[in-house]
């Protein structure tokens, strides 16, 4: 046990107030020679840590699972999940929650070690993680944070000095993940599947207290909980769609109750606009394709509603009706959020009847001409319509006239419209080929400079600076189709 607390550890463990069926207490498995390869300074400070102290050997031992900070209470969480539509009892198979850091601002964040060794939920897995996928999660989660999309974050990555065996021998690593909590739709499915209404109620009460305290005194608090989660997920999925983010594995165990994006295994950002885009090697049917994400979110939330039925109303028929009514509201909430976001991407302040068709026409043309999603909006923002099949087409020129005329009709100036576009159209995203380039250099050569440079550029996606331009270039046709793989 590490007693020295100059690093700033301030751990609580409220999750252990839940019935013990929700977790198993287990220590991390030590590793041979841990080395800190990445520390998130700004996140460390916001959590109340001293970054310089975190670089010391005693703290690196904590990130590796070789020691525990004062107040730690390591545990693996139990949950269930529909994985590609099939229900399984699951749990943290390679991660441990070591505690909840209480920040100087009075907020509570889970501190989880990912890749910390086997747990009772490992299901024949080795409980370990490889360096590449852990660095990938660090890069993408930080890019999402910079894009202002709710997300779990990465505090540190350490190498273990031990190999991890997947298809080949890979260097092992442990990621320290930070989240508002790790309560998932699958956590509620787990409680419901066990058949204890008391446990289900305990989980719902704990979740409300932790994430939605404003509804604690609500007359129908469990219905209100469902409403709040639906609202947050509608907003989250709209934000994904607006930047072209494809999660890749929207199983119910990867849908958080807090409304944060979690699990960056097979995710990627879309290059050419195509509703059918899939990157994940295991998503052979396209279940989680870009255009399907809103529908899959609604499906996942319906599983949450099902799990809550025993506590929504004492009459089962009435409870079922409440669940169905609430789930039916998701699509309208999502559409509203997405439409509002799309209007901002096109500099539209006011509401006009033609806006829907203006947006639809542009997306249809982008799909037809295989236009780069991010760069199309970037070019419209900068008003630099370089020679591309889309911009050279007569139909785009016609659309452009309509759009310009629509901008002129507004009370707001064109300058203000373009400024709003700039704040809503990222100049840079973590392009798949650039992320791979950074990972290749780090994993094979121990060269982290490529990753550092990429992270620096991704930190201000709406800045439109010249040093970002090299990262705006789409991949060469030879780099497509890009495939992602689950780290496990």
Curated annotation (Swiss-Prot):
<protein>
    <recommendedName>
        <fullName>Protein nucleotidyltransferase YdiU</fullName>
        <ecNumber>2.7.7.-</ecNumber>
        <ecNumber>2.7.7.108</ecNumber>
    </recommendedName>
</protein>
<feature type="active site" description="Proton acceptor">
    <location>
        <position position="253"/>
    </location>
</feature>
<keyword id="KW-0548">Nucleotidyltransferase</keyword>
<feature type="binding site">
    <location>
        <position position="114"/>
    </location>
    <ligand>
        <name>ATP</name>
    </ligand>
</feature>
<feature type="binding site">
    <location>
        <position position="126"/>
    </location>
    <ligand>
        <name>ATP</name>
    </ligand>
</feature>
<comment type="similarity">
    <text>Belongs to the SELO family.</text>
</comment>
<keyword id="KW-0460">Magnesium</keyword>
<dbReference type="GO" id="GO:0005524">
    <property type="term" value="F:ATP binding"/>
</dbReference>
<feature type="binding site">
    <location>
        <position position="184"/>
    </location>
    <ligand>
        <name>ATP</name>
    </ligand>
</feature>
<keyword id="KW-0808">Transferase</keyword>
<keyword id="KW-0067">ATP-binding</keyword>
<comment type="function">
    <text>Nucleotidyltransferase involved in the post-translational modification of proteins. It can catalyze the addition of adenosine monophosphate (AMP) or uridine monophosphate (UMP) to a protein, resulting in modifications known as AMPylation and UMPylation.</text>
</comment>
<feature type="binding site">
    <location>
        <position position="93"/>
    </location>
    <ligand>
        <name>ATP</name>
    </ligand>
</feature>
<keyword id="KW-0464">Manganese</keyword>
<feature type="binding site">
    <location>
        <position position="91"/>
    </location>
    <ligand>
        <name>ATP</name>
    </ligand>
</feature>
<dbReference type="InterPro" id="IPR003846">
    <property type="entry name" value="SelO"/>
</dbReference>
<dbReference type="Pfam" id="PF02696">
    <property type="entry name" value="SelO"/>
</dbReference>
<dbReference type="GO" id="GO:0000287">
    <property type="term" value="F:magnesium ion binding"/>
</dbReference>
<dbReference type="GO" id="GO:0070733">
    <property type="term" value="F:AMPylase activity"/>
</dbReference>
<feature type="binding site">
    <location>
        <position position="177"/>
    </location>
    <ligand>
        <name>ATP</name>
    </ligand>
</feature>
<feature type="binding site">
    <location>
        <position position="127"/>
    </location>
    <ligand>
        <name>ATP</name>
    </ligand>
</feature>
<feature type="binding site">
    <location>
        <position position="254"/>
    </location>
    <ligand>
        <name>Mg(2+)</name>
    </ligand>
</feature>
<feature type="binding site">
    <location>
        <position position="263"/>
    </location>
    <ligand>
        <name>ATP</name>
    </ligand>
</feature>
<keyword id="KW-0547">Nucleotide-binding</keyword>
<feature type="binding site">
    <location>
        <position position="263"/>
    </location>
    <ligand>
        <name>Mg(2+)</name>
    </ligand>
</feature>
<keyword id="KW-0479">Metal-binding</keyword>
<feature type="binding site">
    <location>
        <position position="94"/>
    </location>
    <ligand>
        <name>ATP</name>
    </ligand>
</feature>
